[in-house]
């Protein structure tokens, strides 16, 4: 899950300008660097978020597509499954690895963000604003516009959102992007034991009230992925707009 520019926090803090990144990306593209095209597309996506936040500021804290206001998402941020999602204890390795990395480092790869957002809003049928608020508390590259658009893209309530029937399977995604389980083992002590300082650092970073230790067994999944997908699709298909 490497291969990012690592500039997201610099952009969010104003330490580097989008136009400077754009010019550097164009130069790299002209020099034949294939990844430059992806970089430029992501930069445009970021600026699109700011465009939307300026012209339709409701995207920052409300459904951009207002017909989603009556969708039956869970809105209880104290829900047990929500807390397990926050703690990286869902029993779904890709989700948990990404959430623990987030808590320790304040960072998360874009692929991880898509997976954990899809899982929360679709498999757990939880309102995207709960996830957005947790990201706001944890990310060092927190960007109101980009994150609001990203969460609403995953949930289906935003502009140019992912189709409602696109529900990421975290286990399939793990096999595709982390086939050797290097990322999983880097962040989940239950799989790596005491061989990963990164995984163990999570238990030093978390609040004591969570009462989690590296010796604990890895939890069972909070939801069956197949059943969760079917339930989400049924809810999306039967939504009343």
PLM feature spans:
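C-terminal catalytic domain of photolyase/cryptochrome flavoproteins
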Residues: 1-241
